[in-house]
Amino acid sequence: SSVGSVLKSKVVCYNFGEAGAEQTDKQVGTEEYEDSVIPEIYFMDESVSVAVGDHSFAVYEGGQVPVKKREIQVGQEIRSSFHTEKYIGFVLLNQEKSGYEVRLYNKAGKQVMNRAFTGEYSNVQMVGDEIIMYEGSACCIITKAGVPRFKGDLKIDALLMVPAAGFNKYLVMSTNELRAIYLAK
């Protein structure tokens, strides 16, 4: 919403069980964010959830009544986000030099990895210990420690890419096939 010329986003937590039974409209929590858009909210597990803004994110804890535990200002524009049960990750527009930056945080909101990279990838996911980024046939894989594993051309336009059993083996799904590939540096 916008009040005057100030942009505001509101995160509302509902509980349709016993904890929300006595609350108006089952609302058990509300948090307003000024001058920020919150386009994504997800659960990492049954008691930790994350609200992602355009320049920050907030970690909430509590299964029945989520409470904001910390809010982290990222300091750069968040282009995309990804997560696992252990990590919160972002692709950021790198303001210091051309290109982008991938940044990884643990559930507590502590930064654990930061790595600059070039290229634009609209698909970003974390599977196991790897951050897999791809767009068309271009691909970049970085480990959770920030070590580049692969950057190159897959020779197939990927709609989905996941690790498979075997060393450097991945399954790549395109519009008309599922292909097993082995990546070499």
Q: At which residue positions do the language-model features occur?
A:
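Repeated scaffold domains used in trafficking and secretory/extracellular systems
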Residues: 28-46, 73-85, 116-129, 156-169
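C-terminal amphipathic alpha-helical segment
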Residues: 63-65, 76-80, 87-91
